[in-house]
């Protein structure tokens, strides 16, 4: 982080000619093939001559925010490679993985701000270049957060969700926790936040009861409608507290959650929408594209992956009947999953968590 502009590597530009690119084998053009000699290089447009490119490059390298940009770029590189790859690329092995974490970026950002503030201002005399540097740092920062989220173990995510749920339960009287519908309320509360708990809600639950859950229940209601207010403030106080609870838990509207869940179950073989599909889902649900992204990232971890793991366990430990049903009884009230052999796989999952064969 403390490296200065003179210590940063300078990369050759197009205008520096083939001699400057000799050290980069991947950048050297291939030898002429059987299609004849290469055409002569076209002249650069006005403003992109060698002097102009060198001047623009020097302005970027000399910008006060460039060391911070280089730092977050290196953190993204460390986050995308294994320790073996990092050592081979000369990046070193991060100690405990903390070097490329988002928390370490916050610490380095604070240290960088103190250092630069004591020496020179953050911005230059070129507002366009200042905006470019800030936007580049923000984009790389978002990439670093997504990379860290993608590498987070699923058990840690579940423990974090469980801890948050237990804290919510502590806010209510002990008598409310003895309700007979406690397990269903707990499942609905987690489904409203776009996640499905992977543990066993109760002793009588089936193999996939925690995954399918009570999908037909009203979302957005959850725990708040079944717990009486401990105070005597009446309905007005409940109405004041409900928006705060919904905002705390990040509950999506029922219609939006049903639309995204239906799309997910219809595309189980590739359970992540493309950019065009995201835009369509944003229009249909009224959510932001960031909320849609986060919902599908969480759904792939908490819904799709457990289904795949469960199907693998069933495929390894159970025989199959000719109709595709696994040999062994089950009750109609228990959620179940039945798979056909790989040559004739065909199934669908409706919003109630029931499998149907195609």
Swiss-Prot record:
Residues 25-56, 192-251 are annotated as: Disordered. Residues 96-149 form the MEIS N-terminal domain. Residues 245-307 bind DNA. It is found in: Nucleus. Keywords: DNA-binding, Homeobox, Nucleus. Residues 207-219 have a biased composition (Polar residues). GO terms for cellular component: nucleus. One of its GO terms (molecular function) is DNA binding. GO terms for biological process: angiogenesis; animal organ morphogenesis; brain development; embryonic pattern specification; eye development; hemopoiesis; positive regulation of cell population proliferation; positive regulation of transcription by RNA polymerase II. CDD domains: homeodomain. PANTHER family: HOMEOBOX PROTEIN TRANSCRIPTION FACTORS. This is Putative homeobox protein Meis3-like 2. It comes from Homo sapiens (Human). The lineage of its organism: Eukaryota, Metazoa, Chordata, Craniata, Vertebrata.
